């Protein structure tokens, strides 16, 4: 592609020789594939949760800890990933993330063979560490591949592939995992002999092998393509790092930036709310709708992903025409209202409200992210790393919601937790609205 860079201040890809904007179609397409791939891993967790809950006899709280193991990997990796990218490049962070992703997924084969729950959790942790690298690199990279003014649009466009990956993951998981071995009622399980029960539970676990081996192959293929593709270098990679100083100096500067601090809190709440809502949606349906099975309830989970996908398209269109923080405020307020309906109405009404809520979650993550890293300049890498670290919210809010549901004796009451999270996001959006014109 020639001698290229992305300016730190304007965040615009240019050709040094021609002095004109360049179109990085192939790099952008490969970056979009990463958004697809990490959506697959994230949303397969919502399939694994009810599968492991029956196979390993877990309570709602214990099942929520699956997300804790997963998101802890997200929590610890962004800072090391940011340091790696500072010393090398965004591309190095992406390749590292893909290899970790493949390694973690590969562990599912031996874990299923020996039916070792701990090894599954280790695999999920490693997958999440890889995804943390990918998100730390890809999210800011997408925002700087062009004019800063259209960074929100590019990130939301890339996140559309994330929504598509979420739909594929649920359909993929439903057909190859949940439907492969039908879940049995407790009455049926009680009538099984110890040998039959053991064989049945092992069959539930073995059903995850094929899907995750397919994932390993695809991830390694994408890693190879990225290794062979030339990506534009960021000017900060080559010129600004000397001025950036130490990690502590960067953190000190970031701590004084109010919109970044709010973005960290808002993103923690968003990931927590989204993960909790999706993780317990199948349980919500089974508990609230008489005769509902986990396999059929997965159709509602697919519906949430379709709503998410549609919401992403409409949200991206709205953001191209209205101020991003105003669209975010409206979406957060509607999502909060739908969670409250699911908490107090229950039944089919609550389930439909919970399904529709995903349409209004759709643009929240990328919009919070792009608002949070705006004007961070030389601190963009570390600033984005901290925002990615807030994904630990999915590992904290989910078990909290599980604990509340166990204590209340039902899932709907626990929907008040994500409603509270969306209220915080609404406050963040209003904060952005008040300061955007100052």
Swiss-Prot record:
Optimum pH is 5.5 for fucose transport. The chain crosses the membrane at residues 27-53, 62-87, 91-113, 118-144, 151-178, 194-227, 258-287, 294-319, 325-343, 348-372, 380-407, 411-430. PROSITE patterns: MFS. Coiled coil: none annotated. Pfam families: MFS_1. The keyword Cell wall biogenesis/degradation does not apply. It comes from the Bacteria. Changing residue 278 to I: 30% decrease in L-fucose transport. The keyword Membrane applies. It catalyses: L-fucose(in) + H(+)(in) = L-fucose(out) + H(+)(out); D-arabinose(out) + H(+)(out) = D-arabinose(in) + H(+)(in); L-galactose(out) + H(+)(out) = L-galactose(in) + H(+)(in). Keywords: Carbohydrate metabolism, Cell inner membrane, Cell membrane, Fucose metabolism, Membrane, Sugar transport, Symport, Transmembrane, Transmembrane helix, Transport. Residues 54-61, 114-117, 179-193, 288-293, 344-347, 408-410 are periplasmic. It is a multi-pass membrane protein. Residues 2-26, 88-90, 145-150, 228-257, 320-324, 373-379, 431-438 are cytoplasmic. The record marks 46, 135 as: Important for activity. It is found in: Cell inner membrane. GO terms for cellular component: membrane; plasma membrane. Induction: By L-fucose. One of its GO terms (molecular function) is arabinose:proton symporter activity. GO terms for biological process: arabinose transmembrane transport; fructose transmembrane transport; fucose metabolic process; fucose transmembrane transport; galactose transmembrane transport. NCBIfam families: fucP, PRK10133.1. Belongs to the major facilitator superfamily. FHS transporter (TC 2.A.1.7) family. Contains an outward-open, amphipathic cavity. Contains only two acidic residues along the transport path, Asp-46 and Glu-135, which can undergo cycles of protonation and deprotonation. Asp-46 and Glu-135 have an essential role, coupling proton translocation and substrate recognition. Sugar binding probably induces a conformational change in which the outward-facing cavity closes, thereby bringing Trp-38 and Trp-278 into close proximity around the bound sugar to form an occluded intermediate. Mediates the uptake of L-fucose across the boundary membrane with the concomitant transport of protons into the cell (symport system). Can also transport L-galactose and D-arabinose, but at reduced rates compared with L-fucose. Is not able to transport L-rhamnose and L-arabinose. Binds D-arabinose with the highest affinity, followed by L-fucose, and then by L-galactose. This is L-fucose-proton symporter. It comes from Escherichia coli (strain K12). The gene is fucP.
């Amino acid at each position: 592609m020639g001698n290229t860079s992305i300016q730190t201040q304007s965040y615009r890809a240019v050709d040094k020789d021609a002095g004109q904007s360049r179109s990085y179609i192939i790099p952008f397409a490969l970056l979009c594939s990463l958004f697809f791939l990490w959506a697959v891993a994230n949303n397969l967790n919502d399939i694994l949760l009810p599968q492991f809950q029956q196979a390993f006899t877990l309570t709602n709280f214990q099942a929520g800890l699956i997300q804790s193991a997963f998101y802890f990997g997200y929590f610890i990796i962004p800072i090391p990933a940011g340091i790696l990218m500072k010393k090398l490049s965004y591309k190095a962070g992406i390749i590292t993330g893909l290899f970790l992703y493949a390694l973690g997924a590969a562990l599912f084969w031996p874990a299923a063979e020996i039916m070792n729950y701990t090894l599954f959790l280790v695999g999920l942790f490693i997958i999440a560490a890889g995804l943390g690298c990918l998100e730390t690199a890809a999210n800011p990279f997408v925002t700087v591949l062009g004019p800063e003014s259209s960074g929100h649009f590019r990130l939301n466009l890339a996140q559309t592939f994330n929504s598509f990956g979420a739909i594929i993951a649920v359909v993929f998981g439903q057909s190859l995992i949940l439907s492969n071995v039908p879940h049995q009622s407790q009455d049926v399980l009680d009538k099984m002999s110890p040998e039959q029960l053991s064989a049945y539970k092992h069959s539930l676990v073995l059903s995850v092998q094929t899907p995750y081996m397919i994932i390993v192959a695809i991830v390694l293929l994408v890693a190879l393509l990225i290794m062979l593709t030339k990506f534009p270098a960021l000017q900060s990679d080559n010129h600004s790092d000397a001025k950036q100083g130490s990690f502590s100096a960067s953190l000190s500067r970031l701590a004084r930036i109010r919109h970044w601090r709010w973005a960290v809190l808002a993103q923690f709440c968003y990931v927590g709310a989204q993960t909790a809502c999706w993780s317990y949606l199948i349980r919500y349906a089974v508990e609230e709708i008489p005769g509902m099975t986990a396999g059929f309830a997965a159709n509602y989970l697919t519906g949430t992903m379709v709503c998410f996908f549609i919401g992403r398209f409409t949200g991206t269109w709205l953001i191209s025409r209205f101020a991003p923080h105003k669209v975010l405020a409206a979406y957060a307020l509607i999502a909060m209202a739908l969670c409250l309906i699911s908490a107090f109405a229950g039944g089919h009404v609550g389930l439909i409200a919970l399904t529709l809520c995903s349409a209004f979650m759709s643009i929240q993550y990328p919009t919070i992210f792009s608002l949070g890293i705006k004007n961070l300049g030389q601190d963009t890498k570390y600033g984005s790393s901290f925002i990615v670290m807030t994904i630990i919210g999915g590992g904290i809010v989910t078990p909290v919601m599980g604990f509340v549901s166990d204590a209340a004796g039902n899932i709907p009451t626990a929907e008040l937790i994500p409603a509270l999270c969306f209220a915080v996001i609404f406050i963040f959006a209003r904060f952005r609205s008040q300061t955007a014109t100052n």
